[in-house]
Amino acid sequence: MKSCHLKLAEAAFFIELFEATQERTESLTRGSDLETEASYLFSAIMNSFYSALDQWRDPATNKKGYEAFVKQNPEIYSHSHFGGWRSTTVHVGHIPITHAGYIPPKGGEVSLVFSAPPKLASTEIVEGRADLTFSPYYYVAYRGELKEVVSFARAHLHKLTVLIEFNEQSLP
């Protein structure tokens, strides 16, 4: 397995841990609160994305694809003075969770997420019953806009995985 694929798996791992902090409604460690732990995991997710993309990059074969992807995703990959999260958390300072709670989707949209619950947050499954669980969502700010972390991170992980796998298939 190529190193960039391990970094994609690492990002998925941190996203699941992040989601577990939301669903458990209690911190994972003794030394932190939920929002602090979520912000640590957010930084880890951003670093995993950056590492996967950087390890995939090859100036001889995919320079244009790399540059286009970075340009399309400035909230992660731009320099810190432009608000890039990864660069800010590594070179400037900590990125706190901006909001914990629920912000409805814009324009009457409905956001349904169907996925397996994080293993750390799993509860006993009762056959024939569906439980709706409401817990806070964590948001981070980018240029005045709040982005829900888990949805954003899952969508970005998918885009990054598609980029890497598509380009590997098209190589001779």
Each model region followed by its residue ranges:
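Acidic, Ser/Thr/Gly/Pro-rich intrinsically disordered interaction regions
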Residues: 1-40, 61-172
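Core of folded catalytic or high-affinity ligand/protein-binding domains
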Residues: 36, 40-55
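Glycine-enriched, solvent-exposed interface loops adjoining structured elements
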Residues: 56-60
